[in-house]
Amino acid sequence: SVSLLGTIVKYLALTMLVPLIVAVVYGDDIWVFGASLMIALVAGIAFERLDPEPDIGPTEALLLVSLAWFGAAAVGAVPYLVAGYGTESTIGLDPSSTGALLGSVINALFESMSGFTTTGATVLGSISVEDHSHAIMLWRQLTQWLGGMGIIVLMIAILPELAVNGAELMQSEAPGPELQKLTPRI
C-alpha cells in the first residue's frame, strides 16, 4: 500500500502546478511552488517504487485511506513550510529557537490538514492577498476543494458497497414521520 500512497502523493504534487502557474503570472512565490512540487514529486515516485506490484486487501485499503489523509497533509504543508507562512510570528517564539521550527512544522501541518478536511480553520491570521501571495491563497483554497471532492468520491465509492441508496440515506437523516418520493412527470 506504500506504493499506492506514492501514486496519491505524486498526483497531489501535480496539483501544485496550478498555484505554480499563478505564481509565475503574479511573479511571487515561484520558487516556493517549484521546490514544493519537486519535493513532493520525488517523494511520490520514491514511495511508488518501493512495491511495484502492491497486493491490496480490505485491511490494506483501510490503511491506505488513513495514510493518504496524513500524506496529503504532509504534502500540502510543504508550500507553507518553504514559504514560511504561519510560522514563529504566529506562535510568538524566537525564530532561531528549536521550538520555532517545531511550531512552524505544526502550523503548516495544521493549515494543510484544515484544508484537506475542509474545516476552514487557519493559522495564517488574516486571509487576504494583501498579507499572502496569490499562489499561497490559491493553494489554501485548492486544498479545501480537493478535500471536498475527496469526501464526495469516498461517499460515491462507499455507499453502493453498503447497499444504501440516496432515498434510504435521506430517510434515515430527515426529521419527521415519513419521506415521500417525488414522482417525475413529463
Model-based region annotation:
Residues 1-186:
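Membrane-proximal intracellular helices of multi-pass ion channels
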